[in-house]
Amino acid sequence: VRPVPILPCAASPAHISASWSRNSPRNGRQAGRESALRERRGAERRRAAGAGPNRRLVFVDRVLVALVALRLGLPHAALAELFEVDRSTVSNAIREIRPLPPARGFAVPDRPGLRLRTLEDVFAYAAAESVDLRIDGTEVQVRRPAPGRPGRKAFVSGKRRQNTVKTTTFSDGQGRALFSGVVRRGRMHDQTAVRSEGIAEQFRQHPQVEAEVDEGCRGLANELPDQVSAPPHKLKDDAPLGERHARREARRRQSSRRICVEHANAEYKQWRPMQRYTGRREDFAETHLAIAALVSDRSARRTTRRTTSTELVLARPNAC
């Protein structure tokens, strides 16, 4: 019996078994891969009966391999030595399991059977449940494209001056992630992504949804001042002292309401691939969505903190 590695993951083995065992991707993904190879060859593959790769990892082992790779970022060769299989077997297992968490969607607090998979789902949920959104972008350093390749500068971030990939996170007022996506190259500004990916259009379709954003989405706050709140504008140098104090207090209050989405981003950064991604850039989006979906399962189980009302209530009705 092979030793099972200790898995520092957000999901327990019981949760993984109950959620994923009925969604094994073997048949669908394998059929799609064989179809693509058939089109590339132009004919059926001539193979003797019983020939082909011997897949020695059962579904539970493939799940463990994928979760260890997502959590710790271990090389596939090291995982192959641990499970006593070939490196290609580990790579195939990770490619099969990695799409499962994004396909399930993001967990919703206090709604066990509800899952959010698209931006439309997020805004519809926020409108129905009167949830104020927190929106923030983050970026992860990736490998630099090869010299001479077209579009090499598209990944260079103007903020970090490194090759990065950016994502956008949506959370509620308690820092529980509702959705994370809008994956784009590091050179694209947050405001450009807001317009090109349909976030601004979703606000127009759901006028009752409100959100807190940072300075990067200033344009969105200018377009929709009744729905989106951004930090106050910077004052002139000759502004009165009272206005400076008022701006500082307003900025502090807005930052206090928005900071919880930074905590949601910090949960992603605890996973090794989100600290610095060393794999293929083409696989980053799928890896990020898988990690974000797993983190949402844990954050959704956090108890909702109820805010005590300060409204005065009469102990007894007034006598007329």
Predicted regions and their residues:
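Charged, often Cys/His-bearing segments associated with DNA-binding zinc-finger transcription factors
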Residues: 1-57, 219, 303-312, 318-320
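Short, flexible segments with low predicted structural confidence
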Residues: 36, 50-52, 61-64, 165, ...
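Short helix-loop boundary/capping segments at the starts of domains
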Residues: 22, 26-30, 71-75, 96-99, ...
